[in-house]
Amino acid sequence: MPPKKTSKAAGAASYSKHSKATWIARDHNETPEYRLLRGYALDPGFSTQLQTMSVNEVVYKIPWEDVTPGPVGEYLEVIDVDPASNCFYEPVDLDSKLVLGQQGLTPSEGNPLFHQQMVYAVVMKTIRHFEFALGRKLIWRHREKHQIKNADKLGLENRLRLQFVRRLRIHPHAIRDSNAYYDPEKVALLFGYFTAQDQVQGANHPGGVVFTCLSPDVVAHEATHAILDSLHNRFIEDTDADVGAFHEGFSDIVALLQRFTFTELVEHQLATTQGRLDRYNVLGELATQFGMALQDERGALRGAIGKANRKGQWVKLEPDPNEYKNTFDPHDRGALLVATIFDAFQRLYDHRTQDLIRIASNGTGELPKGSISPDLVKRLAAEACAIAAHLLHICIRALDYCPPCDIRFGDYLQALITADIDAAPVDENGYRVALIEAFRARGIFPDRVNTLSTESLRWSRPVFNDKESDLFAELAAFLKPEVLKLAQLEEREEIFVKSHILQARLCEFIKKKIKGGSDEWDSFLSKLGLTAKPVKMTYDAVSYTTPVPLLEVHKIRPAFRIGREGKQISQVLVVLSQTAKFPREVENPATGEMETETIKFRGGCTLIISFGAIDQLEYVICKNIRSEYRFGRQMEYQQNKEDSSLGLATYARGESDKYDLSFKELHFHS
């Protein structure tokens, strides 16, 4: 019999009836995972060159969040006021249909709305890398102090609390100057724009306008300054030549390695250089358009592989083991750190790709002249991108393994090695060996380390006697219930408030123990680089004495990280410090009169504690408050800075502590 005919309505009803059990209703208001925004991979000038135009415009993939025009989101607030032009630019609405429908506004040097989109995309991408590597939410540097409510009920003597800063402010057109900088007092990024010099260089338009906010290198660099200052607010205190250099170098490292997240760009450059990273390519250069627009510049602002010589010719950088000892300018010294990390990256890349090169070269190890296979390019680029991602996360994760003040490059090497051992106990791919080789090649060595083995470079585990172990157990018992509560919090402001209250309570807890005058507590604190007694120092035959230094608890944060091999790492970070203040009489060079100034000398420790067993202390990373060696080194360095004949006294910040770094002055380009 022929099949029975049914009406369309009956058929629809039949379909609905039989599919009811398997039909899954979808929420059409489901929030997307990511927001896609177009932007530049390199400086805008590369979009006007045939060789790079196809790879310079990329799509930034950042976590979705609710934003209002600006953009204004959970972490950032873009405020586009141009004081020099007396203009206020309309804020971009990233949720408008026209913007969403085309993955963001079209990249444009002349559209302020795109400028706002660009800075938002790059800074959010940078934040995402930090939060993934550190295993916790980012909280910006505090702005000011105010009263804690109900301080008496909480049992706190210190009634002051640091103010929560919800958003980092970004000003794309803040100044008409060849500068861009992070302002720690405003907790803001200020980007400038300026007129390029009249000489013809690269893709620049002589006399044209250069916007620093359109350089992803500059934006990522400044964002990293803000993040690093939020994680380690003592790293702006200029106590050693490495401090300012570390801020500069680390910010460049993040900007440089983030480039390797753009696979098409990496493939393009490797195809151009026959798969070699030690030849000239744009992957190892930062802020090219910015650098070429300045008077007497000959290329990128900074390069990790090579640089232009006086004749304008590009030459490869070769490691010099004596350069570190003889370089004192923060930019040049920071460039050494960048070159060291990029050297480790190149070593890893060569090591990981040698099998591919052998196969492609029939065992000779030398590829034939001409273009290499597109398949080989893709394989090489995949290795380069994977190595860069791992190395970037190692560099970021190491920040949690640094001492709280007076950072030196040797400390950072130990932090890198220790952080990676925790993340990947077996170094199958040679990351730690490559880092050690690169630091050794440039003469950068830690203090008081006998060998450069990974075992020697790993921060030591604490050695407590029975009584000291009991004292730490007492401290851990105080922390445990509160840390468990902190770990359950999701909202950033609540994390900030609760962690600072806990920090204040821990500070009071330790102070009471110190006031008790117990020798056991002094012995225990000495293992943490702290003291319960007055501090005495001698420098240049002058003695300095101060009462028991002020104790501060800077951080108590749980961290939940994922290592290279998928290993889960759960830890609690506790950062303690003390400040010794020594008065001394100095002559005012302007008036010739004697004045009293205060020498600040800090010490302290980063405690890394197992989250699963809070009474298990994994590392004590300290700078001893009673170290005469460190005190003497700091005094010598800061006195040399005050000698204008050395040309180093350019980084004091005016109204703040005269030994604090000024990022505005640090980044000034005449």
Task: Give the role of each language-model region.
Residues P2-M124, R128-F132, W140-R143, Q163, ...:
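Acidic/polar low-complexity interaction segments
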Residues Q147-I148:
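Active-site pocket-lining segments that scaffold enzyme catalytic pockets across diverse folds
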Residues V586-R630:
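A short, surface-exposed beta-strand/turn
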Residues Q116, V123, I127-R141, D152-A188, ...:
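Zinc-dependent metallohydrolase catalytic domains
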Residues A41, S47, V72-Y75, L301, ...:
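Compositionally biased, intrinsically disordered low-complexity regions
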Residues E222:
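Walker B catalytic acidic pair
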